[in-house]
């Protein structure tokens, strides 16, 4: 391999790594513990995956108040993820325990 080929390969490898890193989506986690979502209010950028993780000993669900998302019942240590791809304020609650509420604010 010539010096030019090695340099071209090195540049291509570097650019491939940068591209892969920039494509990676953001992720946020909301924990469910003691019949509460923590944090109860979360602000993320559009395109962020939000993962809800149940740490309680009983099942919980995630339901968006607009009715567009409803998870299955999450047992202990189960999780549910959803990508918030549009800006707005999204109120959610547990369908099994409606007093459990939270909000995800999505910025552009």
What are these model-derived regions, one by one?
Residues 2-6, 17, 21-108:
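Extracytoplasmic copper-binding redox domains, predominantly the cupredoxin/blue-copper superfamily
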Residues 11-12, 23:
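Cleavable N-terminal signal peptides
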């Amino acid at each position: 391999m010539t010096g030019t080929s090695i340099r071209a390969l090195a540049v291509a490898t570097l650019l491939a790594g940068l591209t892969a890193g920039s494509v990676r989506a953001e992720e946020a986690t909301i924990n469910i513990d003691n019949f509460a979502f923590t944090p109860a209010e979360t602000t993320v950028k559009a395109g962020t995956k939000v993962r809800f993780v149940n740490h309680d000993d009983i099942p919980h669900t995630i339901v968006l108040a607009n009715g567009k998302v409803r998870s299955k019942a999450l047992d202990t240590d189960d999780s549910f993820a959803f990508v918030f791809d549009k800006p707005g304020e999204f109120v959610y609650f547990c369908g099994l325990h409606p007093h459990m509420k939270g909000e995800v604010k999505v910025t552009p």
